[in-house]
């Protein structure tokens, strides 16, 4: 059967969710005994058998990633910037004492997880994407606050749409909760950075806000990031456009934000990565939130309740701002293969079955070569002994 297979029939691609049936996920294990990660295994059961005393449950020892895959016009499937995500997972893992998943292994596991579920990658002209969720965590019966003897790395996939949709959002600055402390774990994608904000995000939604924004916890005078995505501001002065991105070690290094900056530079725009003072919110022509799940969405307004400040932007007219629209269109066109990917972001998914067969042949050839070389060596030693 040709790879990749066509999209599965009978799915409403506009209404897919994490409950969409998938064929399975990929697993690798690390043990202290071997000191390395095992060969990837494709597992059909979506449920994990993990000891109840595993550190992931009690100490939050886990890190994760989020990538996406799209189908191009020719039917090929591409994963967006998997190398960047691999390096980011290594960084996140280092913050919570998890052995790094080598980049090559990460890429192989992502390719296998996507390739084995290729039929649920949406059609090229459909809304949505295949969302890829790598996760690594400490496991096994382990109560001590020390590195355990075993870790599990998994790559799951599911169908998904844009997290916030495409309409401009109303943002609320959180003032009663600090996302991350200086010199803390704010730069990592670890669970402890996200679950505490859930109750605040839910309260904000009840109050009529779509997304929450964080100031720095030390001085509360600088913009850091949205709870789900990176912050990008735009100054527009006629034909001159400047994007401003907060430069702080307390936020996650956003893959999409990095892509947006590269796109902006290719368009001749100026990009400034620096500290962004709260007072500067009133000066931006546009504000955007960008991330893997949200892609790029305009911010309609930003509210700070304690000061009664409310900043309105060009997108207040219920349409995406012009800068956001241009960048978003370019991103999606590159992701879906409509225009040339001059940045090399999109990596083609290979048939995992063919790759496994090829690897098996290569391994066998290496073993034969090794055996032959050892045989020659033993033969030479025998000749020397006879002489």
Swiss-Prot record:
Against SUPFAM superfamilies, the record matches this protein to: D-aminoacid aminotransferase-like PLP-dependent enzymes
Q: Which UniProt keywords apply?
A: Aminotransferase, Pyridoxal phosphate, Transferase
> Which domain of life, per UniProt?
Eukaryota
Name the Enzyme Commission number(s) assigned to this protein.
2.6.1.-
- Name the cofactor(s): pyridoxal 5'-phosphate
Q: Provide the binding site for pyridoxal 5'-phosphate.
A: 88, 225
- Locate the active site: 189 (proton acceptor)
The EC class name is: transferase
Q: Which family does it belong to?
A: Belongs to the class-IV pyridoxal-phosphate-dependent aminotransferase family.
Write the protein's name: Aminotransferase lcsP
Annotated organism of origin: Purpureocillium lilacinum
